[in-house]
A protein has these predicted regions:
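C-terminal engagement/docking regions of AAA+ P-loop ATPases
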Residues: 223-233, 239, 247-377
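Walker A/P-loop
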Residues: 2-40
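Canonical AAA+ ATPase core
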Residues: 35, 54-59, 75-88, 96-184, ...
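Amphipathic alpha-helical transducer elements in NTP-driven molecular machines
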Residues: 18, 41-44, 63-67, 78, ...
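Short glycine-rich substrate-engagement loop in P-loop NTPases that contacts/grips substrate
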Residues: 40-71
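Conserved RecA-like P-loop NTPase ATPase core
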Residues: 9, 47, 79, 92, ...
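Basic, amphipathic alpha-helical bundle interface domains used for macromolecular binding and assembly
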Residues: 168, 173-277
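Phosphate-binding P-loop
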Residues: 1-4, 12, 68-71, 107-109
Length: 377
């Protein structure tokens, strides 16, 4: 929301997509919200406001009465987004990307801070939905509860309300409690933070990792298929991702984007749901690629030194492999801890990082053992 980027929640019915979307508006103080359940019969009047009969009569002007509709909302939730007709979808293109709405012969700058859409399915192919799909920068899959203890907790929680209504005690307390209201973001804070986010720098090593990810997306191995996929990510989407990275750094009191901010961007890169995990693996490998390359180079050099017995026991006369191994281990541990401390890295993502690093640490241990061969008679 602070980055101003759009979100789409994808998943089967009954996994609380609507509840999540509706509760996001409670983050803003005095925010106006608009929500609508799309259908094949939805009209632009229902989303953007009806045509003003008074304007037509008095000045022969075609304008919509937008008060209470999407053009005046801070937070918007559109359910079943792909069921909307072409007229609504085409208007949403400029609403989402430029936050502009053409009302008659006037162009309105919208107060829109966050637009959340939801659907049970991906957009159908061949129906001209690609441009609108590309506008949704963050793509989150909502899935049923996996852990048994969490499922039981949900069953026993009398406050859980999958409708998203604030009628449940837990939601009402959050929305109306005075203590929480002090934490809500005001319009002035939002504008100030937005300017500060623009000033956040991006480290050169972050750009290097992004380049590796971008190249890797040209040949993605999905579900061990024989043919690799070339996953297209538009320049506009990369620009929006950079904004998300700056927001991540700002929210964690940093003046520059670090590599630890990069892991969640896999949510912005997939086109088909089965690509998600493969792209997450690509991002994780890209994050640790500099350290992996150092390990490969060191192992190759060590193999040569063992083969030709070129290393001496004194550090001055040979390469300090022990020191390099310690340095690599420290680098792995440091980045793993940074990812673990990042506010936007989920527990599932942390588990994937740990699984990847287990093999990395094993390789370091084997390499450490190999160094002993340098001193064998």
């Amino acid at each position: 929301a602070l980055a101003g980027e759009s979100v789409i929640l994808l998943g089967p019915p009954g996994v609380a997509k609507s509840m999540v979307a509706r509760q996001l508006k409670t983050a803003f103080r005095d925010a106006h919200s608009f929500e609508y359940l799309m259908s094949r019969f939805s009209t632009p009047d229902e989303i953007f406001g009806p045509v003003s009969i008074q304007k037509l009569k008095s000045s022969d002007t075609y304008e919509r009465a937008v008060d209470g509709y999407l053009p005046t909302a801070d937070v918007v939730f559109l359910d079943e987004i792909w069921k909307a007709g072409p007229a609504i979808q085409n208007t949403l293109l400029t609403v989402i990307n430029e936050k502009l709405f053409r009302n008659g012969n006037k162009e309105m700058h919208l107060p829109l801070k966050l637009l959340v859409a939801a659907s049970n399915e991906l957009p159908a192919k061949g129906e001209g939905l690609e441009a609108l799909w590309d506008r949704f920068v963050i793509r989150i899959e909502s899935r049923p509860i996996k852990l048994e203890k969490n499922f039981r907790a949900m069953l026993l929680d009398s406050h859980a309300d999958f409708s998203g209504s604030t009628g449940g005690l837990g939601h009402a307390d959050f929305a109306n409690n005075a203590d929480f209201s002090e934490l809500k973001i005001t319009g002035e804070e939002y504008a100030e933070w937005s300017e500060n986010i623009n000033r956040i720098g991006v480290k050169e090593e972050v750009l290097d990792v992004i380049s590796v990810i971008r190249k890797s997306l040209r040949a993605v191995n999905v579900d061990e298929a024989a043919e690799r996929r070339n996953i297209y990510v538009s320049d506009r989407r990369w620009k929006n991702i950079a904004r998300l990275l700056r927001t991540s750094a700002f929210m964690q009191d940093r003046e520059e984007v670090d590599c630890c901010d990069l892991l969640p961007i896999y949510h912005c890169l997939w086109q088909e749901s089965e690509e998600r995990d493969a792209i997450r693996t690509i991002v994780i490998r890209a994050l640790f690629a500099p350290l992996a390359e150092k390990l490969v180079e060191m192992k190759n050099a060590l193999a040569e030194d063992i083969k030709y017995h070129r290393i001496r026991k004194t550090p001055d006369e040979g390469r300090d492999y022990e020191g390099e191994i310690e340095s690599l281990s420290d680098g792995l541990t440091s980045l793993e801890h940074q990812l673990g401390d990042n506010l936007f890295v989920s527990s599932d993502d942390k588990a994937e990082v740990s699984a990847y690093l287990r093999d990395f640490y094993k390789e370091l241990a084997f390499t450490r053992q190999d160094t002993m061969k340098l001193y064998e008679d």
